[in-house]
Amino acid sequence: MARYVYKFGGTSVADARRLYAAARKLAAAQRQGNEVIGVLSARAGQTDALLALAREVDPDCSGRELDALLSTGEQCSIALCAMALR
């Protein structure tokens, strides 16, 4: 069994159509008997939007809180991809 890692950038998961396309690639590779790992970025523009909001709240934002906030973009993409795979 081969192991494949698929990386999808923000544009690749920017909307439902593209997200389904990414999910189909993951599912197809797995159906062929491969071990599949999906790595997903936040949707296009989402990280910038979160960063802008954080800077409105705290112009000097940094550290742990900012890291936690920005990671929600990836978590959103992961959850949506899991839904698309069902």
Which residue ranges define each predicted feature?
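Nucleotide/pyrophosphate-binding catalytic subdomain
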Residues: 1-86
